């Protein structure tokens, strides 16, 4: 005894210390979680690619450019809701950028796409997980409300920034004449708004349908 404080018996201390087997199990679970996240990130990137490449409606614009109606951005947001802003943003940016790189019409937009889609995921993920904590136990009304708000935040950012970034990118990086770049940006803004409205509906409907299925299967991840 030292100053009235008794030291626990060695056997008791041994019980309190995690065993090597327990530590290995914890590390293995962490590795499994990481692998699952990477697999799901790749899956969401593939869905973004497919949604843009095969489910888009191209719209030629004055000045020789082309914009499109598509739901690729919806999967960027859905990835952020399921995986968090970081992994979700990477999934969206990779999937959509690869789609641009493999399409001669959109290949010059790839750098812009990578940045904007990453931001969509980061913003939607921040609202969903840092503000609303939607992966915790809440009623369906709360989940629907905040998945809607997160979608509006991420896709709303894109509605504002896509034409602005697109204008400067085409004008200063690609060397497109200012007046032509403005016309292209205006057309792109209209298509981006339609995509955002449709995308928001898709995100909320799909997330509300997929969430209980993943929970029942034990595959739903809680994002802190």
Regions found by a protein language model. Give the residues of each.
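Loop-helix junctions at membrane interfaces
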Residues: 2-8, 12-224
């Amino acid at each position: 005894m030292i100053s009235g404080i008794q030291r626990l018996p060695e056997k008791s201390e041994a019980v309190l210390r995690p065993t090597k087997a327990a530590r290995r199990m914890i590390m293995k679970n962490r590795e499994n979680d990481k692998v699952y996240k990477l697999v799901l990130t790749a899956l969401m990137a593939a869905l973004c690619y497919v949604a843009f490449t095969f489910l888009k409606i191209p719209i030629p614009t004055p000045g020789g450019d082309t914009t499109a109606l598509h739901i690729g951005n919806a999967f960027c947001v859905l990835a952020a809701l399921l995986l968090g802003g970081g992994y979700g943003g990477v999934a969206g940016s990779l999937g959509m950028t690869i789609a641009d790189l493999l399409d001669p019409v959109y290949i010059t937009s790839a750098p812009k796409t990578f940045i904007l889609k990453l931001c969509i995921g980061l913003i939607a993920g921040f609202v969903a997980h840092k503000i609303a904590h939607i992966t915790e136990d809440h009623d369906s009304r709360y989940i629907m409300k905040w998945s809607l708000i997160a979608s509006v935040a991420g896709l709303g950012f894109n509605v504002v920034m896509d034409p602005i970034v697109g204008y400067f990118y085409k004008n200063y990086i690609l060397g497109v004449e200012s007046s032509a770049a403005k016309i292209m940006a205006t057309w792109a803004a209209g298509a981006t708004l339609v995509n955002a409205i449709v995308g928001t509906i898709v995100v909320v409907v799909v997330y509300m349908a997929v969430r209980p299925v993943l929970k029942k299967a034990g595959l739903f991840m809680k994002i802190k």
